């Protein structure tokens, strides 16, 4: 780890941790229905939306009604996004004349964006019309993030309330998170990105003549538009030579802003934030990294204020920051190591360079390694370089951060409710060690609570490992692997980890836009999202019904360094050890290969 990366990391954390309390306080006020600086324009619109939908925001829901409302809303979202993709060839705002998306790809994409995963098996500039990008994908970027915030706030209410039967109103939480948090921040960030050169228009694509002929390989497609494979299962490609380049246009900045702030991650273009029209320079890169973790960090402060003790939120934030700093340093160190070719040339370890494969020259190793850590610490999935080109151990950092459950800051809302599940596990373990009934924030942790916590922690590993096994055993699964051996296994493991944990980034060597992977990854995304959410809401309902107990002398404090250390240990030991055998077969084996 060199001085460039250390300076960038310290600057990043300083800005992030200074902004978190300010935004966290605003989120608490907005979600509680208190007056904020946005009330003057937001409240009339909020009331109008309630009247239009026939919703009484004061009518509270128990956890079951809250869960049903959330699930119905998200199922309707899948149907709407699917329909828009299938019909886009007949709809307006399609200057490139793009046809409707294939059924399996459309279903995968619909589930992906509704679940806040934003896994993309397609290239946006050659698949999605402007209308689909705006009305289907961008809208889901907002409401999927708002759903995560709403579920978190319901859990926090469960911890803050006592002897209560309700958790709030899902529709009110959804509207407030969108109107008062996501929309204003996205508007500000979109303007900032436009000022740096990010594209924002509805113009048709521009055809440019290149000075030199370009030659590249493209996947050979069948009559249904699916990639073809040879007798041995290898992908078939065609060589294309051209002197014409299409420069894609579109409403990029408006989608880019919420893609980052909502920890969605789906790029307008295939190259995502490595594309100069999405992320032109170092300033836009810093803004995008800050946007990814801004709301997850701020929600820790919101949590502390809502439960009546800011130190509770600070302790959770401290644990997240310790884990994040460690993983960031690891990624930077391994990516700064010279590749085998550079090592043979006796390149210095601390010299500029390192593993530059798959990295944009305008960002370099340090900014790419930090971006990779940021985007997989959150359930974002946006990338400014190719994770598949990371070194074997450098690629472990983004992979393992996802496998921990996306709790190191994590997604908007989802990261903190996942970390709170680990916090309850930590106090449960501590209670067992000292022979006392475990308590968290004055609530006794009982059998039902631990069953829900266990479901939250173990659901995604089960999906990841089972899905990886199915893909490795199936002919259709192995056919999508471009690189054989340990790295090919890592590509499958990464795809399943990304889908089940709702991240969306990929080791791009896997040809995943096939019926097999579209269905398999779609199932992983759906159950990885909603199994955990329903378990969290059941946990919230159980905690809300409990009386609050006074602090006892022998109780474990949950605001000090000891608790932070115990929480970090619980995340690493319980989360990471689950995947040790799989990691040994993939990136570790690849690293040990001569």
Curated annotation (Swiss-Prot):
It is a multi-pass membrane protein. GO terms for molecular function: P-type potassium transmembrane transporter activity; potassium ion binding. It comes from the Bacteria. The keyword Transport applies. One of its GO terms (cellular component) is plasma membrane. It is found in: Cell inner membrane. Its main location: membrane. The keyword Cell membrane applies. The chain crosses the membrane at residues 3-23, 67-87, 136-156, 179-199, 287-307, 314-334, 415-435, 453-473, 519-539, 562-582. Pfam families: KdpA (PF03814). Keywords: Cell inner membrane, Cell membrane, Ion transport, Membrane, Potassium, Potassium transport, Transmembrane, Transmembrane helix, Transport. Belongs to the KdpA family. Part of the high-affinity ATP-driven potassium transport (or Kdp) system, which catalyzes the hydrolysis of ATP coupled with the electrogenic transport of potassium into the cytoplasm. This subunit binds the periplasmic potassium ions and delivers the ions to the membrane domain of KdpB through an intramembrane tunnel. The system is composed of three essential subunits: KdpA, KdpB and KdpC. This is Potassium-transporting ATPase potassium-binding subunit. The gene is kdpA.
């Amino acid at each position: 780890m060199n001085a460039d990366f250390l300076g960038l990391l310290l600057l990043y954390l300083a800005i992030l941790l200074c902004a978190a309390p300010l935004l966290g306080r605003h989120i608490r006020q907005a979600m509680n229905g208190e007056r904020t600086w946005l009330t003057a324009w937001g409240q009339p619109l909020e009331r109008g939306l309630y009247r239009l939908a026939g919703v009484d925001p004061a009518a509270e829901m128990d956890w079951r009604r809250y869960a049903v409302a959330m699930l119905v809303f998200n199922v309707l979202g899948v149907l709407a996004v699917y329909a828009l993709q299938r019909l886009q060839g007949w709809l307006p705002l399609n200057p490139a004349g793009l046809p409707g998306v294939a059924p399996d790809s459309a279903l995968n994409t619909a589930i992906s964006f509704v679940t806040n995963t934003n896994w993309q098996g397609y290239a946006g500039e050659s698949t999605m019309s402007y209308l689909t990008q705006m009305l289907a994908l961008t809208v889901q970027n907002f409401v999927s993030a708002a759903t995560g915030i709403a579920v978190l706030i319901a859990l926090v209410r469960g911890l803050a309330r006592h002897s209560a039967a309700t958790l709030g109103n899902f529709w009110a939480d959804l509207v407030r998170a969108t109107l008062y948090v996501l929309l204003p921040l996205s508007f500000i960030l979109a303007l900032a990105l436009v000022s740096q050169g990010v594209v924002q228009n509805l113009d048709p694509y521009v055809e440019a003549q290149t000075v030199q002929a370009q030659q590249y390989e493209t996947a050979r497609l069948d009559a249904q538009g699916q990639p073809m494979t040879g007798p041995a299962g290898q992908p078939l490609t065609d060589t294309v030579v051209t002197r014409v380049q299409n420069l894609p246009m579109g409403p990029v900045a408006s989608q880019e802003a919420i893609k980052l702030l909502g920890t969605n991650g789906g790029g307008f273009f295939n190259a995502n934030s490595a594309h100069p029209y999405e992320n032109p320079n170092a300033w836009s890169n810093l803004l995008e990294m800050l946007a990814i973790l801004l709301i997850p960090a701020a929600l820790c402060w919101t949590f502390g204020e809502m439960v009546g003790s800011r130190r509770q939120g600070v302790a959770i934030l401290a644990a997240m920051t310790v884990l994040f700093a460690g993983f960031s340093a690891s990624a930077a160190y391994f990516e700064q190591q010279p590749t085998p070719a550079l090592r043979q040339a006796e390149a210095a370890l601390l010299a500029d360079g390192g593993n530059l494969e798959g990295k944009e020259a305008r960002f370099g190793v340090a900014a790419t390694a930090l971006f990779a850590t940021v985007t997989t610490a959150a359930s974002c999935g946006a990338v400014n370089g190719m994770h598949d080109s990371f070194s074997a151990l450098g690629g472990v950092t983004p992979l393992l951060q996802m496998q921990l459950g996306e709790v190191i800051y994590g997604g908007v809302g989802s990261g903190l409710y996942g970390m709170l599940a680990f916090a309850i596990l930590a106090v449960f373990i501590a209670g067992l060690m000292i022979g006392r009934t475990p308590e968290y924030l004055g609530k006794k942790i009982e059998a039902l609570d631990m069953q829900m916590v266990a479901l939250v922690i173990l659901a995604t590993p089960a999906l990841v490992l089972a899905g990886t096994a199915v893909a490795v055993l199936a002919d259709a699964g192995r056919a999508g692997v471009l690189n054989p051996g340990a790295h090919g296994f890592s590509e499958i493991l990464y795809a399943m980890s990304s889908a089940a944990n709702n991240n969306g980034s990929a080791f791009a060597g896997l040809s995943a836009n096939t019926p097999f992977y579209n269905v398999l990854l779609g199932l992983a995304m759906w159950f990885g999202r909603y199994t955990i959410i329903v378990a969290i809401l059941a946990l919230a309902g159980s905690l809300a019904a409990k009386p609050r107990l006074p602090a006892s002398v022998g109780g474990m404090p949950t605001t000090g360094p000891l608790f932070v250390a115990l929480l970090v240990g619980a995340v690493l030991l319980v989360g990471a050890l689950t995947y040790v055998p799989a990691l040994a077969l993939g990136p570790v084996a690849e690293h040990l290969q001569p």
